[in-house]
C-alpha cells in the first residue's frame, strides 16, 4: 500500500472515529437530556458537566480525547509523516465537529484535538492539561482556557519536540476558529462561566 493510500485511509478512519459523539451517547446511557438541546447546546464535556455532573463529564472527556489519540498514535506507528499526521488529527476533530452519524451537529473539538496531541509525549500532555486546568480555575471560562491552551500548544511542542510543531499549530488554528463565537461573547462580557449541576438538597 502506498503512503498516500495509507494517509487517505487513516484520514477517513479518523473522521469516522471522531463522528462518534461521546456526549450524546453518554447522556443517553445515563438517562440525561440530549446535550444538543440542553444547556449551551454544545455536545461536549463542559456542557455535560452542567447538565449531568462531574462523572458523566469525565466519561465524555476521556472518550473524546481517545477519538483523537488513537488515530494519531496509529498513524505515528505506521510511519506517516508529520504534516500528514496533522491532517489525520484534523480529520478526527472535524468528525467531532461535524459528525456524520449525528446530523453533522457536533462539539468544539477541544478534547479531541488535545487527545491527538497527547501521543507526542507525556510531557506535552501534562503541559496541556495543567495549562487548561489552571486557566479554567482562574477564569472559570472553559472557552477561554481552551483558546489560551491552544495558543500555548505549538510553543510547548516546539520546545519539547519540534518535529510536530506544524501539525500541532494546524490543530490549534482549528480550535481557535471553532471558538470565534465564544471569542465575541468573551469580548462583550456575555460568555457563560462553568458551573456544575447542583444536586437537590435532601429533606
Curated annotation (Swiss-Prot):
GO molecular function: acyl-phosphate glycerol-3-phosphate acyltransferase activity
Subcellular location: Cell inner membrane
Record's catalysed reaction(s): an acyl phosphate + sn-glycerol 3-phosphate = a 1-acyl-sn-glycero-3-phosphate + phosphate
One GO cellular component term noted in the UniProt record for this chain: plasma membrane
Membrane topology category: Multi-pass membrane protein
Pfam families: G3P_acyltransf
Transmembrane intervals: 7-27, 82-102, 118-138, 141-161
UniProt KW keywords: Cell inner membrane, Cell membrane, Lipid biosynthesis, Lipid metabolism, Membrane, Phospholipid biosynthesis, Phospholipid metabolism, Transferase, Transmembrane, Transmembrane helix
NCBIfam families referenced in this protein's UniProt entry, alphabetically: glycerol-3-phosphate 1-O-acyltransferase PlsY
Family: Belongs to the PlsY family.
PANTHER family according to UniProt: GLYCEROL-3-PHOSPHATE ACYLTRANSFERASE-RELATED (PTHR30309:SF0), INNER MEMBRANE PROTEIN YGIH (PTHR30309)
Designated name of the protein: Glycerol-3-phosphate acyltransferase
Organism field: Shewanella baltica (strain OS155 / ATCC BAA-1091)
Native organism taxonomy: Bacteria, Pseudomonadati, Pseudomonadota, Gammaproteobacteria, Alteromonadales
